[in-house]
Regions:
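Hydrophobic transmembrane architecture of multi-pass small-molecule transporters
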Residues: 10-13, 17, 196, 399, ...
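C-terminal membrane-cytosol helix-exit motif in multi-pass small-molecule transporters
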Residues: 192-209, 227-236, 255-269, 506-513
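Transmembrane alpha-helical cores of Major Facilitator Superfamily
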Residues: 36, 72, 76, 103, ...
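Small-residue-rich packing faces within the transmembrane alpha-helices of Major Facilitator Superfamily
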Residues: 79, 106-107, 130, 191-198, ...
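Transmembrane core module of solute transporters
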Residues: 27-77, 182, 219-220, 233, ...
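Cytosolic juxtamembrane N-terminal segment immediately preceding the first transmembrane helix
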Residues: 1-38
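Helix-loop-helix hairpins in multi-pass membrane proteins, especially solute transporters
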Residues: 87-220, 224, 237, 322, ...
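C-terminal module of multi-pass small-molecule transporters
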Residues: 81, 92-102, 116-120, 138-139, ...
């Protein structure tokens, strides 16, 4: 187990121009709005999956696989370009990259709203992923350049809390829109918010860049894009097939890993690397990165099937489902901005371990949910999950971002988001395949009376089974009960797997994150920062701001 670091903390003297310092909270508000747009859209989509799966004119008749790809096409492009966007932000200017990203995201949203088929929706979601890849790293990178080091934990906590706000607003907004408008309105609603964000960015957000970026590492950029795209595609393909031994899965996964190994070797030998690999040798930094990947692995898979549990099994509407998830968001909004105070008292190790255990407990609770579980139990579980997340994300994000010089904030943010997205993609794919394969195994014995042409479709998901049952009329009534039972059994198995991943994350942070530093300073702002940040002789020069 690691010991609290006593290495010197980089000087935290005045580095932000006074005029910019005075408007730092207004800038943070604009950054939160930009982040809100991106996260809100994904949380809306989780509530809308049932509607999109319905036949036209209600939806577009998307299959379970197409629903997953409407999420995963976004993830594939997003994860593949995160390193590149962070690097470009450090070199070209973070404000420019942010403006580009939010504009592309708005265009993609408008196109997605007008999609006439699942294929078009998947393509336009990829465009949205392209825009988001340039937004999320830039928001955190700008934050690191407008706040002094001692205020960064507080600002990051508020920034992380905005994710909770998006989680709260998204499903409720989606439910209201779906009850009154067509399904495309969940994307069209982004457009006016994007226009507002663009106006505020032009007015308030300063530009900043690395004053001495060196030559752009073109081979490194290309290797990172190819490696990440291949890896994430293979993961997604494995989840789609529910078989990770298929050659169409192994080839891209192994190919992606091989390219990423070449990327790491290249970065270690380059005199102008896109990512300084030496940071990964620091236990606190690597543990923080691993924690992000593991917690999103566990949560993203559960988030995907919870919408089906609430709407298909429990019979709640999209709006009601959004309201039921509200405690998770409220907990994040309440606790994330205050997480730094708990870290200062108990240290990052204890706080993040406790957060991971809360998340794991919440995930394990799904293994006991039935069709008639009291609503108050669901609310308590969602609140515990949100409280756990609120005590994980701010401390580990601070550990990652304060490990790098301010001039490399874009790269640090890209690392943060890349591991989150790869972890999330793994969660949807692996846990999604566990859910689908378990469901098919449970329901197959009840499909004997289903016409052969519909049998394969009926075993795809609970929504597909219920749709086939409706087509069969009175003859399909006998499928409804077994479909609910099969889904609940599959959800229980998947929940146990998710909780195990959450426990693995707790072990990682307990072993490697720094504990409470002598004198009462917490692990992220002091111990973690010292353990992972440049020492005094490596203190970077101020970034250019304007």
């Amino acid at each position: 187990m690691s010991q609290p670091s006593t290495a010197p903390v980089p000087p935290a003297g005045p580095r932000v121009p006074e005029a910019l310092h005075r408007r730092r909270w207004a800038v943070l508000g604009v950054l939160m709005l930009s982040l809100l747009i991106v996260v809100l859209d994904n949380s809306i989509l989780n509530v809308a999956v049932k509607t999109i799966a319905a036949p036209a004119p209600t939806g577009i008749g998307a299959t379970q696989s197409e629903l997953e790809w409407s999420i995963n096409s976004y993830t594939l492009v997003f994860a593949g370009l995160l390193f590149t966007s962070g690097l470009l932000g450090d070199r070209l200017g973070r404000k420019k990259v942010l403006l580009f990203g939010i504009t592309v995201f708005g265009i993609g949203s408008a196109l997605a709203a007008l999609s006439g088929s699942p294929g078009e929706l998947i393509a336009y979601r990829a465009v949205m992923g392209l825009g988001a890849a340039f937004v999320m790293p830039a928001t955190l990178a700008v934050l690191m350049n407008v706040f002094e080091r001692d205020e960064q934990p507080k600002a990051i906590g508020i920034w992380a809390g905005s994710v909770g706000l998006a989680i709260a607003v998204g499903p409720i907004t989606g439910g209201i829109l779906l009850e009154h408008f067509w399904w495309g309105s969940i994307f069209l609603v982004n457009v006016p918010v994007v226009l507002l964000a663009l106006a505020l960015m032009l007015w308030l957000v300063p530009d900043s860049r690395d004053p001495d970026p060196g030559r752009i590492d073109i081979p490194g950029v290309l290797l990172s894009v190819v490696g990440l795209v291949l890896l994430v595609y293979g993961i997604i393909r494995g989840g789609e097939l529910a078989d990770f031994t298929d050659v169409t899965v192994l080839a891209p996964v192994l190919g992606g890993l091989a390219v990423l190994v070449v990327f790491v070797l290249h970065e270690r030998r380059s005199d102008h690397p896109a990512i300084d690999m030496s940071y990964f040798r620091k236990p606190a930094f690597s543990a923080a990165v691993a924690a992000i990947a593991l917690v999103f692995f566990a949560l993203m898979g559960v988030t995907f099937f919870s919408a089906f549990y609430l709407q298909s099994v429990r019979g709640y509407s999209a709006l009601e489902s959004g309201l039921l998830i509200l405690p998770l968001a409220v907990a994040q909004m309440v606790f994330a901005p205050r997480a730094r105070l708990v870290v200062e008292r108990f240290g990052a190790r204890a706080v993040c371990t406790g957060g991971m255990l809360l998340v794991a407990a919440g995930l394990a609770a799904f293994a006991f949910f039935e069709a008639d579980t009291p609503v108050w139990v669901l609310e308590v579980v969602f609140f515990l999950q949100g409280a756990g997340m609120a005590h994980i994300m701010p401390p580990v994000t601070v550990s990652i971002m304060q490990a790098l010089p301010r001039e490399k904030a874009g790269s640090g943010s890209a690392i943060n988001n890349t591991f989150r997205q790869v972890g999330g993609a793994l969660g949807v794919a692996v846990l999604g395949s566990v859910l689908s394969s378990t469901y098919r195994g449970e329901i197959e014995g009840h499909l004997g009376g289903v016409p052969a042409a519909l049998r394969d479709t009926a075993g795809e998901s609970v929504e597909a089974t219920l749709a086939v049952a409706a087509k069969l009329g009175p003859a399909g009534k006998d499928l409804v009960g077994p479909a609910y039972t099969a889904f609940l059994d599959a959800m229980h198995v998947t929940a146990i797997a998710s909780a195990a991943i959450g426990l693995a994350g707790a072990v990682v942070v307990a072993l490697f994150l720094p504990g409470r530093a002598p004198g009462g300073a917490g692990g992220t702002g002091a111990a973690a920062g010292a353990a992972a940040a440049p020492t005094s002789d490596e203190t970077p020069t101020p970034a250019q701001t304007g």
